[in-house]
From Swiss-Prot:
Residues 74-115 are annotated as: Disordered. Changing R55P: In MC2DN2; reduces but does not prevent interaction with HSC20 or SDHB. Its main location: mitochondrion. It comes from Homo sapiens. A motif (LYR motif 2) lies at residues 53-55. Ubiquitously expressed. This is Succinate dehydrogenase assembly factor 1, mitochondrial.
Length: 115
């Protein structure tokens, strides 16, 4: 087996440090493992993305070590049951209107009556 590159060693070290820092915090170890597993398939050539994720992980490590973090979780959008276009309380998306009140230019949406 070939030796790990410097970046690979840094990522592995970050993984171990995050697991250590997350001990005793509900959801932390599972979240760390899931996050690393999600990005494990990144190609080695995608160095910019790997470095970005590494920096993001270092910031998360600092937060975990700071003592202010008592647990670790993530905001997730609930999946809609099969056959329904959106989740609970979501309006159906007809594809014609933007998802927010501003269109792609950032200008407010105008109503048909001109207001």
């Amino acid at each position: 087996m070939s030796r790990h590159s410097r970046l690979q060693r840094q990522v592995l070290s970050l993984y171990r440090d995050l697991l250590r820092a997350g001990r005793g915090k509900p959801g932390a170890e599972a979240r760390v493992r899931a996050e690393f597993r999600q990005h494990a398939g990144l190609p080695r050539s995608d160095v910019l993305r790997i470095e970005y994720l590494y920096r993001r992980g270092r910031r998360q490590l600092q937060l975990l070590r700071s003592g202010h973090a008592t647990a670790m979780g993530a905001f997730v959008r609930p999946r809609a049951p099969t056959g329904e276009p959106g989740g609970v309380g979501c309006q159906p998306d007809d594809g014609d209107s933007p998802r927010n009140p501003h269109d792609s230019t950032g200008a407010p949406e105008t109503r048909p009556d001109g207001r």
